[in-house]
Amino acid sequence: MASYRLLLLCLAGLVFVSEAGPAGAGESKCPLMVKVLDAVRGSPAVNVGVKVFKKAADGTWEPFALGKTSEFGELHGLTTDEKFVEGIYKVELDTKSYWKALGISPFHEYAEVVFTANDSGRRHYTIAALLSPYSYSTTALVSSPKEGAL
């Protein structure tokens, strides 16, 4: 029964993450956006450090972009369509610092998502994460850029 409740909480959180945010956030012109929700408090995760890396031809990870989530738990403007070319990317969320700032000792040092972008044509990606001190889950919302949004 406890696992069922946890599953429902996670699903509800992911719905919140995909729909929460300021008016017009769904119309974002950003080709890569990050949304983070605190599952413990049921609110956006504010000031989460985000680092994005791009995999180089030699297999190393090169820094690509960085920032922190806003009061809405979102990070826009990480890159442009011109710079966000086909490739393998890694998004790393500094979950340890987030939980430590709240006085909680977390299990994970960070949460990461590794994905291939734009291999099927130009797309916009929203990486959504649901955080708790001992677990995290992620999902991606992938869409075609809207006409006139480029």
Curated annotation (Swiss-Prot):
InterPro entries: Thyroxine_BS, Transthyretin/HIU_hydrolase, Transthyretin/HIU_hydrolase_d, Transthyretin/HIU_hydrolase_sf, Transthyretin_CS. The keyword Signal applies. The modification Sulfocysteine is found at residue 30. Residues 1-20 form the signal peptide. Detected in plasma and cerebrospinal fluid (at protein level). Highly expressed in the choroid plexus. Detected in liver. It is found in: Secreted. Pfam families: Transthyretin. GO terms for cellular component: extracellular space. The modification 4-carboxyglutamate is found at residue 62. PROSITE patterns: TRANSTHYRETIN_1, TRANSTHYRETIN_2. GO terms for molecular function: hormone activity; small molecule binding; thyroid hormone binding. Sulfonation of the reactive cysteine Cys-30 enhances the stability of the native conformation of TTR, avoiding misassembly of the protein leading to amyloid formation. GO terms for biological process: purine nucleobase metabolic process. L-thyroxine binds at residues 35, 74, 137. Glycans are attached at residue 118. Gene3D superfamilies: Transthyretin/hydroxyisourate hydrolase domain. Homotetramer. Dimer of dimers. In the homotetramer, subunits assemble around a central channel that can accommodate two ligand molecules. Interacts with RBP4. Belongs to the transthyretin family. Thyroid hormone-binding protein. Probably transports thyroxine from the bloodstream to the brain. This is Transthyretin. It comes from Sus scrofa.
